[in-house]
């Protein structure tokens, strides 16, 4: 699964069309997909926010990447499949190498899940070679 997140003012947004096999019960997304979307979108938002805070263009060197230190998801409603899923995020805090992002997942016009991710910046010495160039 690959997603792309963009800024929409102070919020980040991702539109995703899940494959029908990401199902829990017929017609609804399984919880692991929901958690993965919140996680991936939130760590991407953390990286984008860090670039912004350093007044740098996205993907300039040295690269900024984040890993999940903590992921909390509250499942509010079953998320229907068959349409697009929207994930929105907002940065709550940037403190050194840590960024806290709150995100919510919208499907069928309703907020189906809320999440909070504590993301930590990957040290440059741990960056895979392909990301350093």
PLM feature spans:
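Non-catalytic linker/capping segments at the edges of enzyme domains
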Residues: 1-26
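Hydrophobic residues in beta-strands and at strand termini
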Residues: 16-18, 75, 121
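Hydrophobic beta-strand-centered segment that forms part of the acyl-chain substrate-binding groove
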Residues: 44-86
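HotDog/MaoC-like acyl-thioester-processing domains
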Residues: 77-133
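Conserved beta-strand residues within beta-sheet cores
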Residues: 2, 15, 68-72, 86-88, ...
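Amphipathic alpha-helical recognition patches that constitute DNA-binding helices
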Residues: 33
């Amino acid at each position: 699964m690959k997603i792309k997140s963009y800024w929409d003012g102070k919020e980040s947004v991702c539109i995703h069309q899940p494959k029908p096999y990401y199902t829990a019960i017929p017609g609804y997304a399984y919880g692991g997909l929901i958690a993965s979307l919140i996680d991936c979108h939130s760590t991407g938002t953390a990286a984008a926010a860090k670039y912004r805070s350093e007044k740098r263009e996205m993907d300039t060197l040295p690269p900024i990447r984040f890993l999940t230190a903590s992921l909390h998801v509250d499942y509010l409603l079953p998320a229907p499949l068959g349409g697009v899923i929207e994930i929105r995020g907002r940065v709550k805090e940037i403190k050194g190498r840590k960024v806290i992002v709150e995100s919510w997942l919208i499907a069928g016009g309703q907020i189906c899940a809320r999440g909070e991710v504590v993301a930590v910046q990957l040290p440059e010495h741990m960056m895979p070679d392909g990301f350093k160039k």
